[in-house]
A protein has these predicted regions:
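C-terminal ends and interior cores of transmembrane alpha-helices
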Residues: 85-100, 323-336
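Glycine-rich segments within core transmembrane alpha-helices of 12-TM secondary carriers
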Residues: 136-168, 376-389
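Central cavity-lining transmembrane alpha-helices of secondary-active solute carriers
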Residues: 51-71, 292-305
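Hydrophobic core of transmembrane alpha-helices in multi-pass small-molecule transporters
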Residues: 102-120, 339-354
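Intracellular juxtamembrane helix-capping segments at the cytosolic ends
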Residues: 119-133, 352-368
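Extracytoplasmic
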Residues: 12-42, 124-125, 269-277
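Multi-pass alpha-helical transporter architecture, strongest
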Residues: 2-3, 7, 214-221, 415-436
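Extracytoplasmic gate region of multi-pass secondary transporters
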Residues: 31-35, 155-166, 244-292
Length: 436
């Protein structure tokens, strides 16, 4: 008899924790198109505008380990509540940031907001893994992660239909060129005030939603996980023992590196779709529609992938999806025009299962007493999203590389990342075969 993904006694908790995946998906994907928006309205280079992503994903790198130590000391529920509080504070800081019109203030606001996301991801991912049988843990996480693109699509929809169409700085002439740089300083100041207020509003709204979720979770009793029960019984590892165990687990160790590469690839692909489309003369609001299609493919891939995992080993499927992503990335690099853009969008289908699969594979054979810190390093791997986009932005600023549009050639960076994921899927699958 097939074991259920989630038993009835954990179902309400599973639903509640799964809602958090949508919350951080919203924050991720309303922020991606803001890179291009800030680049125009604040008159920044692509490299400097991508500091939005550096601040956003740098927050994960800064707070993942402190979050794990906090959860280790207290509980998963405490970590969730603190994460939601930090999320709300960062969102509400957009109010003074828009008033002062300081790009650095927006970066700080996002940095604090992602302190909260680091707590939520460090907590929610291993919590979902623990809510049922170990054999179904990776499939269970893939199912929960399928609701992350729901939040992402919501964020993209808000950006596409509410934020980007209202940006006066994106108005263009008959030739499709942005006219904002040609305006007087007085006109620019007026438009900047308007546009930053438009950018601010969805963050304030999501901050209010986060506060409501915080109250609901605060009033809900959560089940104790295996690691929390062992802690209560005095069965714990020291931090040094945990670090040693993790380091000597090759699949875990390589999984952290694969996750760094995956997040870097994901953020580069989704952030610079707009610049790729802009290079084809497409305005930001229309370009964002391609991001929505990409995320819809990603959402579909999560559900399809979760179903296929009943018949195909997760490790093998990860390798196959890595190959598919690499082929599409080559299309985005080598093919100019709309066909190249379609190839770029199609990458998202193959990225769909990567994050939860790498996460689940890496933690599958980690002792439950080590999962807090193990999860933290996998969340900390999101730093890949901070490090690589500025490098891609610098490539895009070159305009042409080897006679090709620089925006096309910049996708060599995510291609390298996908090759790493193919190798990880293959190596983890071969190790599983050797054990059997």
């Amino acid at each position: 008899m097939e074991k259920p993904l989630v038993s009835k006694k954990y179902l309400f908790t599973f639903i509640l924790i799964t809602s958090l995946f949508a919350l951080w998906g919203f924050a991720n994907d309303i922020t991606n198109p803001m890179v291009a928006a800030f680049q125009t309205v604040m008159e920044l280079s692509a490299a400097k505008a991508s500091l939005i992503q550096f601040a956003f994903y740098g927050g994960y790198a800064t707070m993942a380990i402190p979050a794990a130590l906090f959860i280790r000391r207290y509980s998963y529920k405490s970590g969730i509540l603190l994460g939601l509080a930090l999320y709300a504070i960062g969102a509400f800081l957009f109010i003074p940031a828009a008033e002062w019109q300081e790009f650095s203030f927006f970066c700080v606001s996002l940095y604090i907001l992602t302190f909260g996301l680091a707590f939520l991801e460090t907590t929610a991912n291993p919590f979902i893994l623990s809510l049922g049988d170990k054999e179904t843990s990776t499939r269970r996480l893939n199912l929960a992660q399928a609701f992350n693109p729901v939040g992402s699509l919501s964020g993209m929809a808000v950006a596409s239909f509410i934020v980007l169409p209202q940006l006066l700085s994106d108005q263009r002439d008959a030739a499709g060129k942005i006219i904002f740089p040609l305006l007087s300083e007085t006109e620019k100041a007026s438009i900047r005030l308007h546009d930053l207020a438009v950018i601010r509003n969805p963050y304030v709204a999501i901050g209010l939603v986060v506060v409501a979720v915080l109250v609901i979770i605060a009033l809900t009793k959560m089940p104790k996980t295996e690691s929390e029960e062992k802690k209560a019984a005095g069965e714990t590892h020291t931090v040094k023992e945990t670090l040693s165990n993790l380091w000597h687990n090759s699949i875990y160790r390589e999984g952290v590196f694969a996750q760094v590469c995956y997040v870097a690839a994901q953020i580069m692909v989704w952030t610079f779709i707009i610049q790729y489309a802009d290079n084809l003369g497409i305005n930001k609001a229309t370009a964002q529609m391609f991001n929505i299609v990409a995320m819809s493919l990603n959402l579909s891939g999560r559900f399809i992938g979760t179903f296929v995992m009943r018949y195909v080993n997760t490790r093998r499927l990860l390798m196959l999806f890595g190959i598919g992503a690499s082929v599409c990335t080559l299309g985005a690099i080598c093919i100019e025009g709309m066909l190249g853009l379609y190839s770029l969008v199609a990458i998202s289908l193959f990225m769909s299962i990567m994050f939860p699969s790498i996460y689940g594979i890496a933690l599958e054979n980690v002792d439950s007493k080590d999962t807090h810190l193990g999860a933290a390093f996998l969340v900390m791997a999101i730093v890949g999203g901070a490090l690589m986009p500025p490098l891609q932005g610098m490539m895009i600023d070159q305009e042409t590389i080897w006679g090709m549009p620089a925006v096309n050639m910049s996708f060599i960076l995510p291609l390298v990342c996908f090759l790493v994921i193919i190798v990880y899927g293959y190596r983890s699958f071969m190790q599983l075969k050797s054990i059997k």
